[in-house]
């Protein structure tokens, strides 16, 4: 074999490797040409696991007829990795599959989806569905550039890719980027995939805003979550990620020690089979970081430790709301609070019999608002050592705690009209003891000391 390069005829050419093409002069050992091809099993593929025919549907939403260039994506597909057919993603493209057949996909434009949440006319994104059961695998980045699987991830590039795909059962062999991600890149990717039982590995250690937001939301057959090794988080990176995964029994480790805005917001909300929570070692918090994280996790019995001593606005807000089997709660060591920091934290935890100590003496607006609302098994309040109250700091704090019969407070004044204790002891036990260890004067009602209770002064 011989070729001509730069007017020079070179003989004795040898192709060294089927995956890495090298043209080598065997006499000099000089590499004349080299091109890395993707390993064959790393093309993104869809495999028909149904015992019969199946049809792939690629539904593309184009916000405006004027979207062109890198957003007007063409894609190639093949059933043998030799013969490739080019399709333009517009409307719905359909590809038939026989039983057991795989269809491979590739692209070399470096761009796939684009979605503009503030102007949907400037949007272009494709959703993949099939008419029967199937699995997906290979390197997802071959949908961006099959010649370079380390291609830079672009914002929204795989947004809603399998959204509401009712027949996707397995994504375990799907390969994701190990490098840094981009804003919204995997948002809602598997959202609503009700048959999905296995998820792909997510090896990235540095995240981007909203990158995994709602990624597996509503995957009701998913029993285990992928490992999440990231230590550098970003705002809303895991927000709603496993929300409504009602078969999920265990959660992945979350090793990050520095949190970001909304990073774990609603992450496991509605995971009704989750029996244990991951350790939460973070000591640097951010506003809303844990908000709604385990809401409606009705099988959760023990809360993780929360070691942070410096907290942030709404950081624990609604964190365990309606965890109806929760009996063990964490120590809350912070002594200086922020607005809404514990707002509704244990609301409707109906099995909770013992509340955590609340050592804080410097309060903030709404800090304990509705914290134990509806905790019907709670009999004794934690000691409330703060002498100076702030706006609605205790509002509805114990409302609906029908077994509560013992409260201790050091407050010195509740008369400023800022509703410090608004309805805080509404619908509690008919009789009880109120330990007034401060100098405050309380009215006899649900916003003070309940009628039928005994006040014991210091």
Predicted regions and their residues:
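Solvent-exposed loop and capping/linker segments of extracellular ligand-binding repeat ectodomains
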Residues: 33-458
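Viral virion structural and adsorption modules
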Residues: 1-37
